[in-house]
Amino acid sequence: MNKWVEAQKWEKDWWSDCRNTVWEDVKQMNLAPYLGLKIVPNEHTNYRIPLNGEKVLDIGGGPSSLLLKCENVQGVVVDPCDYPEWVEERYKACGIEYLPIKGEDMGYENEFDEVWIYNVLQHVKKPKKIIENALRAGKIIRIFEWINIGVSKGHPHSFTKEQLEEWLGGKGKVIKLSGGGLYGQAFHGVFLGKDYDSKAER
C-alpha cells in the first residue's frame, strides 16, 4: 500500500460515517477569516458566509465543505475520499456539485472566480500539482495550510512557508494558533490565478 492510499484510508476512518461533523465545522468557521472570508451572523445563525454569486471550487472540501455555510454561491467540491453516498446527495440538494476525483486530475482552465484550499495539501498525492491546477482553475486562490508539522500516517507531506510561496508565486502570512480546534503554525493568504485579469474586475 503506497503512502497516499494509506493516508486516504486513514482519512476515511477519521471521518467515520460523517454523521457528526460539528467540531470540524467549528474549526472551519474559525479558519475562514484567514482565507479572507467574512462571517456575517443573522437572526438564524452565527455561522454564515454571504457571497455575491461567485463560482467557487473547493479542493479537498470533504463531506462538510465551507461552501455549505455560504449563501449565494455556485459551488464545486472535488475530493477523492470514499464518503457515504448521502454526502453527495446533500451537496446536490444544496446546489453544490460534488466530484469524487483527485485534485491532481482536474482539468479546469480559468473556470472559477475563486479556488479554496484549506487543511488539505498534507493529505494529497502531489501537492505541487494541486497548486498548479488551482492557479489554472481560478482568478484567485484562498489558502490556509499547516506548515512545519512533520509527516505521519494520515499526513504524508509537510511544508514550509517558502515552499508554498514559491509554488503560489506570491507572499503569504504565517500565524501561530492555539485554540478553537486550530493548533500549530498556519500559512494563509489570497493569491492571483495564472490568468487573472485586473481589467475584467472593473
Spans of model-derived segments:
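Class I SAM-dependent methyltransferase Rossmann-like catalytic core
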Residues: M1-P50
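Conserved class I S-adenosyl-L-methionine
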Residues: G53-G62
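Class I SAM-dependent methyltransferase SAM/SAH-binding core
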Residues: G61-D105
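A conserved beta-strand element that flanks and buttresses the S-adenosyl-L-methionine
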Residues: W116
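Short catalytic micro-motifs in class I SAM-dependent methyltransferases
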Residues: N119-V120
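A short, conserved alpha-helix within the catalytic core of class I
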Residues: H123-A134
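Conserved beta-strand signature within the Rossmann-like core of class I S-adenosyl-L-methionine
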Residues: G138-N148
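Short alpha-helix
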Residues: H155-G180
